[in-house]
Curated annotation (Swiss-Prot):
A Pfam family the protein falls into: DNA_methylase
EC number: 2.1.1.37
Gene name of the encoded protein: hsdRM
The reaction(s) this protein catalyses: a 2'-deoxycytidine in DNA + S-adenosyl-L-methionine = a 5-methyl-2'-deoxycytidine in DNA + S-adenosyl-L-homocysteine + H(+)
Full protein name: Type II methyltransferase M.BsuRI
Protein's UniProt keywords contain Chloroplast: no
Enzyme class: transferase
Keyword vocabulary terms for this entry: DNA-binding, Methyltransferase, Restriction system, S-adenosyl-L-methionine, Transferase
Domain SAM-dependent MTase C5-type intervals: 59-409
GO terms, molecular function: DNA (cytosine-5-)-methyltransferase activity; DNA binding
Length: 436
């Protein structure tokens, strides 16, 4: 069943809201089988994965759609805290040299990353010294994945985003199938995937149902939960779906982290913009400049010092406003203005949004190597990396239960034996298994 229609200005396919549940299911299966026909045409990957630095005393991590490494850094920090203690790990995290001295003690050991974003890969290489194999290749063309204990990834979600077109027909929405293909090949004990809140309602919820079913079909007990980053010490309103799976033969019941910050008794106060960037008023570093679009001005994009930031977007132009100066003023339906003039306001700087995403100050973001492009274009590369990242402290919270389990798991399995795995299993084989 094909659901293509001609509506000027609305693209090639029906918006998700126009589909019935049966329509959604039909389109999903159609797109899944389209994805199964992707050609994987190279054996070069074998040479790459043979170089991975697999450790028998660590939880070896494979990171897909790795970006600049926010999710990976949070896991590494949680793995270090599980070994040397929370306070010692967090103190070390503030200083690059001290953290680099200790980071090899982390229970998590990243051995392989995959991403196509060149500048993000440069950032990753700068901030993750060691023996990580970086595979800058379209995941649909990666034939072999290395053995590992844990797979992480925030698979692309352009059609899931509440700010996006919300089409269930975007091919990039089905790259999660290649995440599943990596699970089938590598058979890690655990996986963690992150995505935007919008995936919960896309296609009347059927898209998420299908994704969970597909992950489970790979041999995992799967669960998901919507978490808000501000509940874990992140000065930002950022809701994300965290999908977690444990291989069915592993006796570990993952429990999502309880909030550490909030207004309830016993919790730490929410972190605010003042806590995060209040000391950068006189030295914020470079920031994106330019006029504000009508869409931008149709929303109040300014928070006060004592609030949490809006969600950081993957765009310099869409960066939230700095909290300094007067608040925006509403003058009509969906219309806001700067009462004291546009010239008295600016967007959050690269350094400020990195702080809001809880990256340490020593973490460096690449602008690329093309010095001929405009300053805004170079800065936008950094905004995109940071906005796409999982906040480090949210990642740490998600990782902590796994880190604590991992220490006992490795003690009981000192040689970290991994079952023999068939590395030639393709997405076509997965689909035959899933639909049989």
């Amino acid at each position: 069943m094909t659901l293509k229609i001609d509506i000027k200005g609305r693209g090639k396919y029906k918006p998700a809201s126009d589909y019935s549940i049966d329509d959604v299911k039909n389109v999903l299966m159609e797109k899944i089988f389209e994805e199964s026909s992707r050609i994987i045409n190279s054996d070069d990957d074998l040479e790459i994965i043979e170089k991975v630095d697999f450790r028998t005393d660590k939880i070896n991590v494979l990171s897909l759609f790795s970006g600049c490494g926010g999710l990976d850094l949070g896991f590494e920090l949680a793995g270090l805290a599980a070994v040397i203690g929370e306070q010692a790990a967090m103190e070390a995290f503030k200083d690059k040299d001290r953290f680099n001295e200790l980071r090899n003690k982390s229970i998590f050991h990243t051995i392989y990353t995959n991403d196509l974003f060149k500048e993000a890969n440069q950032t990753y290489k700068t901030n993750f010294p060691g023996h990580v194999i970086q595979h800058e290749k379209d995941i649909r063309q990666v034939k072999y994945f290395p053995k590992c204990n844990l797979i992480l990834g925030g698979f692309p979600c352009p059609g899931f985003s509440e700010a996006g077109p919300r089409l269930i027909d975007d091919d990039r929405n089905f790259l999660y199938l290649h995440f599943i293909r990596s699970l089938i090949q590598a058979q890690p004990e655990i996986f963690v995937a992150e995505n935007v809140k919008g995936m919960m309602t896309l296609g009347k919820g059927e898209v998420l149902n299908q994704i969970i079913e597909d992950f489970a079909s790979a041999g995992y007990r799967v669960q998901f939960k919507l978490l808000n980053a501000r509940d874990y010490g992140v000065p930002q309103l950022r809701e994300r779906v965290i999908i977690e799976g444990v291989r069915k033969d592993i006796s570990f019941n993952y429990k999502y982290p309880s909030p550490t910050h909030g207004e309830e008794t016993g919790l730490k106060p929410f972190k605010t913009l003042r806590d995060s960037i209040g000391d950068l008023v006189t030295d914020p570093g470079p920031y994106f400049t330019g006029s504000y679009s009508s869409i931008y001005m149709s929303r109040n994009r300014k928070k006060s010092w004592d609030e949490q930031s809006f969600t950081i977007q993957a765009s310099g132009r869409q960066a939230p406003l700095h909290p300094g100066g007067l608040s925006m003023k509403k003058i009509g339906k969906d219309k806001w203005v700067f009462p004291d003039g546009e010239e008295n306001h600016r967007r959050l700087s690269v350094k400020e949004i990195a702080r809001v995403q809880t990256f340490p100050d020593w973490f460096q973001f690449s602008q690329g190597t093309n010095s001929q492009t405009s300053i805004n274009n170079r800065l936008d590369k950094q905004y995109k990396q940071i906005g796409n990242a999982v906040p480090v402290l949210l990642a740490k919270a998600v990782a902590s239960p796994i880190a604590n389990w991992a220490i006992n798991y490795l003690e009981s399995s000192p040689n970290n034996k991994i079952k023999n795995r068939e590395r030639k299993l393709s997405i076509r084989t997965f689909l035959r298994i899933k639909t049989s």
